[in-house]
Structures are given as C-alpha cells and as structure tokens.
Amino acid sequence: MSTIHDLDRLVRKGVRTKDGNDLGNIIAVDGSNMTIQGRKMLKIPSTYIDFYNGSEVFLTLDIKEAFKYKI
C-alpha cells in the first residue's frame, strides 16, 4: 500500500470499491476529483481513496455509494 502524493500518477489505473467491485479506470484527474470510466462515468472526490497498491486504487465507498457520483 502506498500514500498518493501525485494524483496524476493514477490516470489509467483501475479502481475498486471497498466491497471489491470494479468501477473501471481513472481517465482524468482534475483538482481533487477523479473521473472514472467503466460501466458508468463517475466523478469521485479523491478524499474517498483508501489505498493504492501500485496497480489499483481502492475506495472507502461501496458500489451503491460510488454510483451516487455518476455523471
């Protein structure tokens, strides 16, 4: 697990919810938000990042909470 200091490093990385669901890949970072493209387009604040294992970003949100950020 690593701490993220530069959010731009996360572009093209996979994103999973705390319950293990795959949300897709980060396609853009703007300010403190990540745009994720998968089954749905989401714009999720980076404050919901739990950890990054070097290949995937894990969130503190479950799938239902994450879909509230649909764009």
What are these regions (language model features)?
Residues 1-71:
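Peripheral interaction segments used for macromolecular assembly
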